[in-house]
């Protein structure tokens, strides 16, 4: 489980990014581990996130160099084309922690950037289906202490329950990261429990007409999640139990996620 000292440092960096990139508010969506935190925190004691994942709309990729320079000027070190890191002081204990920032974009957007520079990022940061985050999101206020002190606040568009599950399913399919399984488990607590979460998911699904491509992607993500959480002996429940340091037992995790999946309309 991530320590509050580290996640509050990440939230501090998140606030700074939101203020610095405010002009791009409508063209970027917060996804990754912070989205499940903001979605579930009223119903589940989510630990927060260390990494920051921002989905960029394809149309602003021609301006990526300007965005990159803004990030570097904040003190981030560019590790790869879409990945940055920075040492941030935590407002909790005053210690320094390394925070990572990833920009995500669809394959169509990658054409605006020299492909020779993003080979290492292709699977991690460039994939189709990310436009779901722009169809399914909500606005969230972030208020905390900026790096270097001083309270402030800003707003982000945040991937909602449907788009977060879609992207988390994709993540589970491509890597073995315990935090992704934990985030999925957290999302099934939305509105009070798995049945309530599934009702909200179904409502989101009814309110919009998904494209054939996005329907296929969402179905695939949900099938991956089902396979990973099918029984308490599958990797998903093990990952949640391990990440939570045995706070959530495998049988409880498998049952909770199973109830959620059994009650959603899209199969």
Show the residue positions of the predicted features.
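Compositionally biased terminal segments of proteins
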Residues: 1-267
């Amino acid at each position: 489980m991530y320590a509050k000292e580290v996640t509050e440092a990440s939230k501090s960096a998140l606030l700074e990014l939101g203020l610095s990139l405010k002009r791009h508010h409508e063209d970027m969506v917060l996804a990754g581990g912070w989205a499940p935190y903001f979605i579930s925190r009223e119903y589940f004691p989510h630990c927060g996130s260390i990494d920051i994942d921002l989905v960029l709309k394809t149309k602003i990729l021609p301006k990526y160099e300007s965005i990159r320079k803004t990030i570097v000027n904040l003190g981030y070190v560019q590790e790869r084309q879409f990945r940055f890191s920075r040492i941030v002081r935590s407002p909790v204990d005053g210690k320094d922690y390394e925070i990572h920032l990833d920009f995500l974009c669809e394959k169509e957007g990658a054409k605006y950037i020299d492909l020779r520079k993003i080979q290492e990022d292709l699977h991690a940061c460039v994939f189709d289906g990310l436009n779901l985050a722009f169809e399914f999101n909500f606005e969230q206020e972030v208020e905390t202490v900026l790096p270097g002190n001083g309270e402030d606040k800003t707003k982000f568009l945040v991937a909602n329950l449907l788009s977060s599950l879609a992207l988390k399913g994709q993540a589970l399919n491509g890597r073995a990261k315990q935090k992704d399984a934990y985030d999925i488990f957290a999302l099934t607590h939305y509105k009070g429990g798995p049945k309530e979460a599934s009702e909200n998911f179904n409502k989101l699904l009814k309110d919009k007409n998904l494209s054939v491509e996005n329907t296929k992607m969402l179905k695939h993500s949900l099938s991956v999640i089902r396979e990973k959480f099918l029984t308490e002996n599958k990797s998903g429940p093990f990952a949640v139990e391990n990440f939570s340091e045995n706070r959530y037992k495998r049988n409880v995790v498998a049952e909770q996620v199973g109830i959620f999946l059994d009650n959603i309309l899209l199969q």
